[in-house]
C-alpha cells in the first residue's frame, strides 16, 4: 500500500543528475574537517563545479561516468571556493577508466568512472582517502551525502561551500514505484527521506553516498526538479564494482565490470 501511495504522490519527470543540476537540497554546510576525501570536478570555462568525486588513494578518484568532460580539472582539499585552504591541490586526469572501456552506461547500470591523477597528492589535514565498502548497506541505514551542488531547485542556488545531509537507504521497490521505468534488478541504491525534500541536486553528481564511514554509493540521477515531493535519488552501488575498482587500481587495466 505504501508503495502505491508513493507512486501516486511522486509523478515525476526523470532526468540524469547532470541534467537536473543537483546540489544537496535540505542540508547544511559541511564541517570543514569532515570531507577530506571529497573532490570537485570542473573545466576552466565553467563558473561552477560540474561534479564531485571521492579520493580513494593518493592517485585515484571515483566518480560517475556521466561526469566525464574535456579539460577536466580536479580540486582536492577544497572547502570554500572563495577562500582556498593552504593544503588545497589541483590535478588533471592522467587516465580515465569506464566499465566497458567507453562511456556506455544507463540510469540503472555502470554509471561509474575511475580517474588516475597526473601526479599523486600528499595527504594532509584536508586531503585523505575514503574506504571502499566491505559490505553493501542495509535498508534503513543512515547515510551521508555532500557536495557543492544546488541548494534550491528548479531555481538553483549554488553555494561557495559544500552542504551535507543525512538520508536513508530505501528498498529498491520504492524507487521503482516512484519512477516506473526501472528494471526489476539493478546495480543501484535507492536513498532519500520519503515526503521530505532532502537529497542531491545539480553539481552533486559523482559525489559519495557514505554509510558507516565507507563510500557505498555514487550520486547518479534523480527527479527534476530535485527531490520533487520528496522523491528518492539513485546512486551507483559501489559494492558491486569493488572487484573492478581494485583490479584497475592494481594495474589490470583490461578488467571489466560485472554484467
UniProtKB/Swiss-Prot annotation:
* Group of enzyme by EC: hydrolase
Q: Which domain of life is it from?
A: Eukaryota
Q: Cite the InterPro entries for this sequence.
A: Peptidase_S1_PA, Peptidase_S1_PA_chymotrypsin, Peptidase_S1A, Trypsin_dom, TRYPSIN_HIS, TRYPSIN_SER
Q: Propeptide ranges, please?
A: 18-23
* Annotated GO biological process: proteolysis
Which GO molecular function annotations are given, in alphabetical order? serine-type endopeptidase activity; toxin activity
Sorted keywords for this record are: Disulfide bond, Glycoprotein, Hemostasis impairing toxin, Hydrolase, Protease, Secreted, Serine protease, Signal, Toxin
Regions that span the bilayer: none
Chain ranges of the Peptidase S1 domain: 24-250
The chain's coiled-coil residues are: none
What protein name does the entry list? Snake venom serine protease rhinocerase 5
Disulfide bond residue pairs: 30-164, 51-67, 99-257, 143-211, 175-190, 201-226
Give yes or no: UniProt keyword DNA repair. no
- CC per GO annotation: extracellular region; secretory granule
The residues responsible for catalysis, as annotated, are 66, 111, 205
Main location group: secreted
Question: So what family is this one in?
Answer: Belongs to the peptidase S1 family. Snake venom subfamily.
Query: Looking at the keywords, is Cytoplasm present?
Result: no
Which organism's genome codes for this protein? Bitis rhinoceros
PANTHER family named in the record: KALLIKREIN-1 (PTHR24271:SF47), KALLIKREIN-RELATED (PTHR24271)
Point out the glycosylated residues in this chain: 80, 102, 155, 252
Q: What's this chain's function?
A: Snake venom serine protease that may act in the hemostasis system of the prey.
Q: What is its EC number?
A: 3.4.21.-
Q: Which residues form the signal peptide?
A: 1-17
Which PROSITE patterns would you find in this protein's record?
Answer: TRYPSIN_DOM (PS50240), TRYPSIN_HIS (PS00134), TRYPSIN_SER (PS00135)
Q: In which tissues is it expressed?
A: Expressed by the venom gland.
User: Subcellular localization, per the record?
Assistant: Secreted
Amino acid at each position: 500500500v505504501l508503495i502505491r501511495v508513493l507512486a501516486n504522490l511522486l509523478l515525476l519527470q526523470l532526468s540524469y543528475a547532470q541534467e537536473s543540476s543537483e546540489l544537496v537540497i535540505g542540508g547544511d554546510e559541511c564541517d570543514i574537517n569532515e570531507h577530506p576525501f571529497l573532490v570537485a570536478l570542473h573545466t576552466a570555462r565553467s563558473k561552477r563545479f560540474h561534479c564531485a568525486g571521492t579520493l580513494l588513494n593518493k592517485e585515484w578518484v571515483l566518480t560517475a561516468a556521466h561526469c566525464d568532460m574535456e579539460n577536466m580539472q580536479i580540486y582536492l582539499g577544497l572547502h570554500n571556493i572563495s577562500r582556498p585552504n593552504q593544503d588545497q591541490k589541483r590535478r588533471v586526469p592522467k587516465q580515465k577508466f569506464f566499465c566497458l572501456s567507453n562511456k556506455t552506461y544507463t540510469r540503472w547500470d555502470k554509471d561509474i568512472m575511475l580517474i588516475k591523477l597526473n601526479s599523486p597528492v600528499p595527504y594532509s589535514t584536508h586531503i585523505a582517502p575514503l574506504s571502499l565498502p566491505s559490505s553493501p548497506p542495509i535498508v534503513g541505514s543512515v547515510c551521508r551525502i555532500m557536495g557543492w551542488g544546488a541548494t534550491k531547485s528548479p531555481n538553483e542556488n549554488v553555494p561557495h561551500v559544500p552542504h551535507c545531509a543525512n538520508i536513508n537507504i530505501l528498498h529498491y521497490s520504492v524507487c521503482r514505484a516512484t519512477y516506473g521505468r526501472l528494471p526489476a534488478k539493478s546495480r543501484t541504491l535507492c536513498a532519500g527521506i520519503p515526503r521530505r525534500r532532502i537529497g542531491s541536486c545539480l553539481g552533486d553528481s559523482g559525489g559519495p553516498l557514505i554509510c558507516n564511514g565507507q563510500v557505498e554509493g555514487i550520486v547518479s540521477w534523480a527527479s527534476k526538479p530535485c527531490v520533487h515531493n520528496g522523491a528518492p535519488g539513485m546512486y551507483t552501488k559501489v559494492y558491486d564494482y569493488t572487484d573492478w575498482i581494485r583490479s584497475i587500481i592494481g594495474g589490470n587495466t583490461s578488467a571489466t565490470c560485472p554484467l
